[in-house]
Amino acid sequence: MFKEQIKVNSEDSSDTERRVLDAAGEVFAALGYRAATVRQICEKAGANIAAVNYYYGDKERLYQAVLRSVPDAQAIKYPSRSGLSSNATAEERLRVYVHSLLHRVFDAGRPGWHSKIIAREMIEPTRALDSLLEEVALPLHRELASIVRLLLGATAKDEDVRFCALSIMGQCVYYHHARTVLARLYPEQKYHAEDVARLVEHISEFSLAALRELAQRRQAQGNETP
């Protein structure tokens, strides 16, 4: 019966669903998953208390949808293989990957509450973290690892691949995660489109140089092995 109460037409339904999702993001970010209530979310959204149950099933699935909403939208907006041909080089793939990741973290359209929720999830993990890592983070890490392995060579050690991939990932996310600190240490550091473009170029060049050096060093070590 509540379906008729909250679903007047498809356009109104879509608007209500979006308002509930946005409100949930703000409430979960402010209070955390455990303390937030469905009533608080619906009141903030200006929606019927039954809206969460209708659109998402329950509070837990709403929370999962909130966590996934931003990464899913960013993956569409900034694909990690955007513009690459089927025969793109590993160097080209790395540059596009870094471009994609930096633009995702600095996307002006990214809601402020998303970073807060992710930070909370790292401190107070819920069951949603495992699925988020498996469905969002793991594919990104695997893709980067595959690029790194190509650049290091087929015989590269798994540990080298892992260390290098995490180093590249760390460079990309540090500028965002430590933004408040960096603003005080380096007030001249900005994050406009042209600034992000320079970061993409720097991280790409820096990482490629390091990977080339490591590949040469490992090859030399292999040649010295009796």
Predicted regions and their residues:
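Amphipathic alpha-helical packing segments from all-alpha helical-bundle domains
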Residues: 92, 126-152, 201-205
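Helix-turn-helix
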Residues: 19, 27-61, 65, 69
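Short hydrophobic clusters on alpha-helical segments that form packing/core surfaces
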Residues: 20-28, 168, 207
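N-terminal intrinsically disordered/low-complexity leader segments
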Residues: 1-15, 216-226
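An amphipathic alpha-helix adjacent to DNA-recognition modules
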Residues: 17-22, 55-83, 130-134
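Amphipathic alpha-helical segments used for helix-helix packing
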Residues: 109-131, 179-185
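Hydrophobic alpha-helical bundle segments that form small-molecule/ligand-binding pockets
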Residues: 138-162, 185, 189, 211-218
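Hydrophobic alpha-helical connector segments
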Residues: 79-114, 161-168
